């Protein structure tokens, strides 16, 4: 009948297992020697162990031939071991480098904290001890992963930094309302004469006035003693100073067209 549970299990592919090895396993597992179940010639089991799942606290495997510790047998050891249980493999050195081979098999079998060390017995027979633990989590277990939510990057605002008021950069002269020059005024004083490099049109107007033999006063403030001067040439006498000029209203500046006197040029 198959056993249901054991505090510790010692297996070997040989006919017998030394009591010293059983004592070492009991000490490592923290149990008495009587609580250790021993199985010899494990290769004849066909890679199966007569124990229920997660029913053994610790396992010691004393292997003479590395090929007897196959992947199937390591999977079986992992099945019967409790979560977090220890497995200790003792093997003799050989040309097949059992240290590297067994370590790799244990890692591929899901064991963790795999550590190897050299040891020697009282009869000076050298061996390799490889210790590992079964993971505390169950094979095939799953758990939800929390996806990190990406928020908008936070802008670090330095409260000590002061914002500059744009208005404070303006001077008093900048705030003054600009004074636009009077249209037609060259700003040459009370005489209001055109300047040398006149560009406002005053020089042309003065030239027209000179050709008419009229004063600026007569152009800017025309008056008529007879009352007919402002009506046009049809009503003006032969000696009228405004003869040839367009009609105007007394007291209002006479508007001379741009092509006035063009025929005289």
Swiss-Prot record:
Q: Which Gene3D superfamilies match?
A: Vaccinia Virus protein VP39
> Which positions bind [4Fe-4S] cluster?
226, 229, 237, 240
CC terms in the record's Gene Ontology section: mitochondrial intermembrane space
For the region Linker, give the residue spans. 144-175
Q: In which residues is [2Fe-2S] cluster bound?
A: 186, 195, 198, 200
A Pfam family this chain is assigned to: CIAPIN1
Short sequence motif Cx2C motif 2: positions: 237-240
> Where is the segment annotated N-terminal SAM-like domain?
1-143
UniProtKB keywords: 2Fe-2S, 4Fe-4S, Cytoplasm, Iron, Iron-sulfur, Metal-binding, Mitochondrion
Q: Where in the cell is it found?
A: Cytoplasm; Mitochondrion intermembrane space
Chain spans, region Fe-S binding site A: 186-200
Describe, as the record does, how this protein assembles with itself and its partners: Monomer.
Q: Record's domain comment?
A: The C-terminal domain binds 2 Fe-S clusters but is otherwise mostly in an intrinsically disordered conformation.
Belongs to which family? Belongs to the anamorsin family.
- Say what the protein does: Component of the cytosolic iron-sulfur (Fe-S) protein assembly (CIA) machinery. Required for the maturation of extramitochondrial Fe-S proteins. Part of an electron transfer chain functioning in an early step of cytosolic Fe-S biogenesis, facilitating the de novo assembly of a [4Fe-4S] cluster on the cytosolic Fe-S scaffold complex. Electrons are transferred from NADPH via a FAD- and FMN-containing diflavin oxidoreductase.
Name it: Anamorsin homolog 1
